[in-house]
Amino acid sequence: MANIVVKRLERTPIDETPVEIVERKGMGHPDSICDGIAESVSVALCKMYKEKMGVVLHHNTDQVELVGGYAYPEVGGGCMVSPIYILLSGRATMEVLDKEAGKVIKLPVNTTAVNAARDYLKKAIRNMDLEKDVVVDCRIGQGSVDLVEVFDRKRSEIPHANDTSFGVGHAPLSTTEKIVLETEKLLNSDALKAEIPAVGEDIKVMGLREGKKITLTIAMAAVDKYVNSCADYVKVKELAKAKVEENAKKYLDGHELEVCINTADDDEDCIFLTVTGTSAEMGDDGSVGRGNRANGLITPFRPMSMEATSGKNPINHIGKIYNILSNIIAEDVAKIEGVRECQIRILSQIGKPITEPKILDIEMIPENGFELEELSPKAKEVAQKWLDNISEVTERIVSGNVTTF
């Protein structure tokens, strides 16, 4: 049995606190672009390694930098004059010694990485011309020998932690968290883009709850070729606002809602107009790990890990595995009858099996009529089950079926 500690969460339930702030950076935000590329590169490398070597080899591709380009957006359609520059860096296994054949097998790391980045951009930023609007530069290097040794040690056994680090998760999402998350998903959905094509992918949703009132302040890029006048632009905002308000009704749970879109506009001289749908075209830079946490949100009123999840290897990198695992365990513990809220923290120790954390800390707020003592064994059982089946988490990540930002 792992070192699992269960205790009462000594705080007011989040939905009953007077103030809550929640943020989500959308798919086209420069930081999210970097997160998405980093994870796509990692997933692509996992696939390539398995095809060529039968196993996932050591890599960390969590160092992606975006340098903003320069554009002249205008109603009816503008142009890019300086491309966005994206740097792929990090470490990966580029060659393997085949002792039986007596030769070195070279692996197509850089080609795989660049193709994955460009494929991701094609899906994520619909109006970006990949031939003219962006430059993707790959500078991924060979992995550190000592960390590769920790990664490769006793391959047939449980992977060993690459670092002494921790992961954090919580569940269930609060009303504000749900609305912020679902609002960005709506605005970047295929269905909404088909209906309102002028809505770009660079969207940031900031949610503020004061008592029973939730205010959403949304920054939403518009794509200039679909906007023929300032009146068109205003109409796009009105249509998007109506969609957000209608969608939010499913999650409001008695809360009042106010939606504000592009509050810096004057609707004549200053509007959020872009050529590509992202502010990355206008000098807005981006980096991995500066945006959403592993649950897709930035939640200053909850415990958070500052570590980036996207791009890290899914085999033994604690910054990835334990952050994702913490959220999975929290979600399952929160489903136990009598649990109102749950917070999880998991701490590793470098070189130790990832199934044996130094501590797995569970904090819960019981529902009225339930005692911590009766809930504790059930919560421990959930946590132990996931530690025993941690390879399932890795498989989900390798398959690209886990959201990391």
UniProtKB/Swiss-Prot annotation:
Swiss-Prot/TrEMBL keywords: ATP-binding, Magnesium, Nucleotide-binding, One-carbon metabolism, Transferase
Cofactor list: Mg(2+)
Organism encoding this protein: Methanococcus maripaludis (strain C6 / ATCC BAA-1332)
A molecular function (GO) term: methionine adenosyltransferase activity
Catalytic activity reported: L-methionine + ATP + H2O = S-adenosyl-L-methionine + phosphate + diphosphate
Function: Catalyzes the formation of S-adenosylmethionine from methionine and ATP.
Residues annotated as binding ATP: G141, Q142, G143, S144, V145, D146
GO biological process: one-carbon metabolic process; S-adenosylmethionine biosynthetic process
EC code: 2.5.1.6
Pathway assignment: Amino-acid biosynthesis; S-adenosyl-L-methionine biosynthesis; S-adenosyl-L-methionine from L-methionine: step 1/1
InterPro entries, per the entry: AdoMet_synthase_2_family, AdoMet_synthase_3, S-AdoMet_synthetase_arc
Keyword DNA damage: no
HAMAP family per the UniProt record, alphabetical: S_AdoMet_synth2
Family: Belongs to the AdoMet synthase 2 family.
Protein name from the UniProt record: S-adenosylmethionine synthase
